[in-house]
Amino acid sequence: MNRRKSREVAMKLLFEMSINKEEFSEILKNFKENTDTNMENVDFIYINKIVNGIEQNKEDIDKKIEENLTKWKLNRLSKIDLTILRISTYEIMFMEDIPNKVAVNEAIELAKKYSADNSPAFVNGVLGNMIKA
């Protein structure tokens, strides 16, 4: 199974949930029906763990992100950056089998691929503050 690809799918699903306010099961069903993403080697157990973990711990995760923002508020972040930060923060806080540096690096890679030009440095700064604390 490919964790990077699974993280990317989880990010797409969480982003979609933040926009459409639909249940995860409905978003997942629509995603599988309409995606052009190759779903081979995607770990749906891992995706479920991330999505459900973030949904169950969103308040704590968002608090942790906000504590590590410099001169920013959570509500000013783009939805994609917030989604990426939530995934990596969840991994840092709750998934001991993932080294913090891996969670940070994966977040930077997602930001490079899906967000604005300045987002990788921003994501790195927020998460860097978090793992130093």
UniProtKB/Swiss-Prot annotation:
One of its GO terms (biological process) is transcription antitermination. SUPFAM superfamilies: NusB-like (SSF48013). It comes from the Bacteria. Coiled coil: none annotated. It holds the Pfam family NusB. GO terms for molecular function: RNA binding. Keywords: RNA-binding, Transcription, Transcription antitermination, Transcription regulation. Disulfide bonds: none annotated. One of its GO terms (cellular component) is cytosol. Involved in transcription antitermination. Required for transcription of ribosomal RNA (rRNA) genes. Binds specifically to the boxA antiterminator sequence of the ribosomal RNA (rrn) operons. Belongs to the NusB family. This is Transcription antitermination protein NusB. It comes from Clostridium novyi (strain NT).
